[in-house]
Amino acid sequence: MGRDIPDNETWWYNPYMDIHPHWKQFDQVPAAVYYSLGIFIAICGIIGCVGNGVVIYLFTKTKSLQTPANMFIINLAFSDFTFSLVNGFPLMTISCFMKYWVFGNAACKVYGLIGGIFGLMSIMTMTMISIDRYNVIGRPMSASKKMSHRKAFIMIIFVWIWSTIWAIGPIFGWGAYTLEGVLCNCSFDYITRDTTTRSNILCMYIFAFMCPIVVIFFCYFNIVMSVSNHEKEMAAMAKRLNAKELRKAQAGANAEMKLAKISIVIVTQFLLSWSPYAVVALLAQFGPIEWVTPYAAQLPVMFAKASAIHNPMIYSVSHPKFRERIASNFPWILTCCQYDEKEIEDDKDAEAEIPAGEQSGGETADAAQMKEMMAMMQKMQAQQQQQPAYPPQGYPPQGYPPPPPQGYPPQGYPPQGYPPQGYPPPPQGPPPQGPPPQAAPPQGVDNQAYQA
């Protein structure tokens, strides 16, 4: 039994859709699956719109948060907000409850285009965030790597252009946008095995997925290695630090652990969100096509759409200043995201240790604390290098000490049997009794005065 899909009936809208024959060979998905997907997408869409909307509002209204690095957070929130609004609730939710796509071919292409642009934009924005954090933490003393509003704006423009280039191809015939999975949402056509579609899928896989993931892995791996190496160096220098420097070092160690954890969470979240989708697309092109069932195709869609919820939590709510603004403007949001009091105090201590002028570069308190700690370590290392080496270079001089003269000592020296046995002779008799004899006074000095 094929899937019950209306195509030639007369409705107040045109339900006719171009559906790939691959999907028609499967039995109809149970109604409970459609309703479950509709509820899930509605929840993701509402939370994604509210969460990312709050991020955009607070970052644009709070002057202290309008830093170059936070421009990437705003762009990511805008991308996820649009992704949740268009590709989640209400279009896909309505289609799931109707059990088929109800908006026609033109809307399918627009839906797929918007999902492609803002989905790829989220990936590329996360890549730019990883590059910025690598420059701040992994190479903090490089003046040329300092982020500015102009540089951040140029990088964001590049993200928009890059995402649009790869997403707009199917509109002009390089691939296509079509229904997928349970036929309630549209995306790239990864089922058709012709040269055009295959080249489109491969190029997107390499340049829009693998390249960003390699950059993200490289940046966060080097961040973890950098903070680990500096922690070891700081432990070796701990004995030479005063109380203030030691307090900064301890705060930096806390920042290291937090940054390492966040790095692992970011990479894991990225892989869970987008890797299943990439695997299904490659499997459909180069693997057994029968493995790409409606369920196998729809599950990665759910992971990808849920990423719009994860991103504001990871990139924004972990920001201490952002949490303060949430607590003052939207305290009800934090009721579901309680934080350990010690963690909040550590964040405040980290910020208190850093002068206000040093936080204007856009980095978070953790990144700024790490930057100051590494600057202090590099200063100490430079002082060590300025001290003269001991012993000085070139000492002792070459050829010193001089070699002994040739033929010295003479052959056969000392003579055999020398010194003679029993020489020198041991003293005879018991040791002398009484105190040791006293030295005579110098000439012209009274003996009694000398003894006194």
UniProtKB/Swiss-Prot annotation:
Entry protein name: Rhodopsin
Record's function text: Photoreceptor required for image-forming vision at low light intensity. Light-induced isomerization of 11-cis to all-trans retinal triggers a conformational change that activates signaling via G-proteins. Signaling mediates the activation of phospholipase C. Subsequent receptor phosphorylation mediates displacement of the bound G-protein alpha subunit by arrestin and terminates signaling.
GO MF annotation: an example: retinal binding
Segments passing through the bilayer: 34-58, 71-97, 110-131, 152-172, 200-224, 262-283, 294-315
Membrane topology, as annotated: Multi-pass membrane protein
Sites of S-palmitoyl cysteine lipidation: C336, C337
Domain of life: Eukaryota
Cystine pairings recorded for this chain: C108-C186
Family of the protein in this entry: Belongs to the G-protein coupled receptor 1 family. Opsin subfamily.
Biased composition (Pro residues): 389-440
